[in-house]
């Protein structure tokens, strides 16, 4: 037993130097071992290290492929080597497969999302993918032009019979007075068109429209133009739904066909309205002149007494005074009634 114990102690003492030599040789082997190129998904810091890394990966891939057996999916083989697998994916991205899957695919944008080592170059590639087809945006103006040409070829909504203007030189607007009826100036059996204006002389909107409406007979000599005071022809205003002035209606014969609903009441907008409804083009070089400012439709406000407004104010004041007097009398009666109940 003593010999066995001394033998174990001797082996332990002799084993210490051998263990130290083994550790020294291990450190030496690790120091002599070449450090592989820094890569995360085959992103190298420079081109030389990338080339060295590819050569080392190629040598390692050969025994791996031999151990896996016959040829299989190259992506399965390269999955053992992260750098080579990522190079294969980057090659597919440049071939166009990633663009079909969209930018949200992690295989396409993995490098930029991890470290952003490629810088602005990656964003430039994306912009090229986004704006690679400018022809789609250029096709829209063509479609718009086709739509405009189609609208211009549409038939007018109202087929107006143009009147004969041979021998006529003065084309003016006719204003109806209180005794005249609108139906007397419209032909119920005909298809000629007339533009009728409902206005009031004290309305500032009617006054601002007057010069533009006065110039319309010169722009459309084959059409008729009438104007009437809506306050004097209340029955006609109610019949044709005139709740506000100015109100412009287009008549074909004695039938109203269209109403002008634009807030911008100018000569140009009126020309467009008539052309869209009848298809009749206005004469060129027709503008609002100084004579149109003077008449026949007045362009200045006419100051008159509105008797209806005066009566309304008188009634309102009378009612307020009566209510005030009755309230005071009620206040005097209430205390007396309380005393009677108390007795």
From Swiss-Prot:
UniProt keywords, alphabetically: Cell membrane, Cell projection, Cilium biogenesis/degradation, Glycoprotein, Membrane, Signal, Transmembrane, Transmembrane helix
Residue ranges annotated for the Thioredoxin domain, each copy included: 162-279
Residues in the Cytoplasmic compartment per record: 326-343
Transmembrane segments: 305-325
Region named Disordered: 86-112
Residue spans of biased composition, Basic and acidic residues class: 86-95
PROSITE patterns xref list: THIOREDOXIN_2 (PS51352)
Superkingdom of the organism of origin: Eukaryota
Main location group: membrane
Subcellular location: Cell projection, Cilium membrane
Glycosylation sites: 170, 177, 189, 276
UniProt topology in membrane: Single-pass type I membrane protein
One Gene Ontology term from the biological process aspect of the record: cilium assembly
Gene Ontology CC: ciliary membrane; cilium
Residue intervals annotated with topology Extracellular: 21-304
Function: Acts as a positive regulator of ciliary hedgehog signaling. Required for cilia biogenesis.
Entry protein name: Thioredoxin domain-containing protein 15
Gene source species: Rattus norvegicus (Rat)
Gene name, Swiss-Prot/TrEMBL: Txndc15
């Amino acid at each position: 037993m003593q010999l066995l114990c001394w033998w174990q102690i001797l082996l332990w003492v002799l084993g210490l130097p051998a263990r130290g030599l083994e550790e020294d040789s291990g450190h030496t082997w690790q120091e002599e071992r070449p450090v592989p190129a820094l890569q995360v998904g085959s992103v190298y810091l420079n081109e030389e290290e990338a080339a060295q890394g590819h050569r080392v990966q190629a040598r390692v891939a050969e025994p791996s492929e031999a151990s896996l057996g016959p040829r299989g999916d190259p992506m399965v083989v390269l999955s053992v080597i992260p750098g080579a697998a990522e190079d294969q994916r980057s090659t597919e991205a440049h071939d166009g497969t990633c663009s079909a899957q969209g930018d949200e695919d992690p295989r396409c944008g993995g490098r930029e999302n991890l470290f952003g080592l490629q810088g602005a170059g990656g964003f430039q590639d994306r912009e090229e993918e986004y704006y690679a087809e400018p022809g789609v945006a250029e096709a829209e103006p063509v479609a718009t032009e086709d739509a405009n040409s189609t609208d211009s070829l549409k038939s007018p909504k109202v087929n107006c019979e143009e009147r004969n203007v041979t021998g006529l030189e003065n084309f003016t607007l006719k204003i109806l007075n209180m005794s005249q009826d609108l139906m007397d100036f419209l032909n119920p059996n005909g298809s000629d068109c007339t533009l009728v204006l409902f206005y009031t002389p004290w309305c500032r909107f009617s006054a601002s429209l007057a010069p533009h409406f006065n110039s319309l007979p010169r722009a459309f000599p084959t059409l008729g133009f009438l104007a009437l005071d809506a306050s004097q022809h209340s029955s006609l205003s109610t019949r044709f739904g005139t709740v506000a002035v100015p109100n412009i209606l287009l008549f074909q014969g004695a039938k109203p066909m269209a109403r002008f609903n634009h807030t911008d009441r100018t000569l140009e907008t009126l020309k467009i309205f008539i052309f869209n409804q009848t298809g009749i083009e206005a004469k060129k070089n027709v503008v609002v002149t100084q004579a149109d400012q003077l008449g026949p439709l007045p362009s200045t406000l006419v100051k008159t007494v509105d008797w209806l407004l005066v009566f309304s104010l008188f009634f309102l004041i009378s009612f307020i005074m009566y209510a005030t007097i009755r309230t005071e009398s009620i206040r005097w009666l209430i205390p007396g009634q309380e005393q009677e109940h108390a007795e």
